[in-house]
């Protein structure tokens, strides 16, 4: 679909505008949909992609927040995941990407998910195949699972009501 959209734009504007292209032989991803955003984040769990961007001099620059390193409390289990600074892990995290300042409660299970920044996951929560929106509070004993497609979780956030 994306290829068709690009062709449509090029054909429409080829006589009206100067159009230039740049050949990319390295990793590239179009993140115009939630599914593509999810897939791109999951790609960073593959060593060859992660190493391309972070092994030598990082090619991705981010804002520095001076947060402490991630904290893994007793009982925490993390497998094949990227965990950013400021995170506190008390449960199980597998094949997931956790952005900065994520709190994972006791007995939580996070699998194949992208958890954006400033998210609180209450005790006994199960999140699988999901993208959890920034600044969310997922209450204890919650269950979210994307079956066959990515599920986007947006909860009402009582922590930030003015």
For each of these PLM feature ranges, what is it?
Residues 3-162:
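Left-handed beta-helix
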């Amino acid at each position: 679909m994306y290829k068709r959209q690009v062709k449509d734009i090029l054909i429409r504007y080829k006589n009206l505008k100067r159009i230039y292209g740049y050949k990319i032989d390295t990793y590239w991803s179009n993140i115009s949909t939630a599914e593509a955003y999810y897939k791109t984040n999951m790609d960073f769990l593959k060593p060859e992609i992660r190493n391309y961007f972070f092994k030598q001099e990082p090619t991705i620059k981010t804002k520095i927040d001076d947060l402490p390193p991630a904290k893994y409390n007793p009982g925490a289990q993390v497998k094949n995941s990227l965990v950013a600074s400021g995170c506190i892990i008390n449960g199980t995290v597998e094949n997931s990407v956790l952005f900065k300042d994520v709190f994972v409660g006791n007995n939580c299970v996070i699998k194949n998910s992208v958890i954006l920044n400033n998210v609180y996951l209450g005790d006994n929560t199960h999140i699988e195949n999901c993208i959890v929106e920034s600044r969310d509070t997922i209450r204890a004993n919650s269950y979210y699972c994307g079956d066959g497609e990515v599920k986007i979780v947006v909860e009402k956030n009582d922590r930030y009501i003015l």
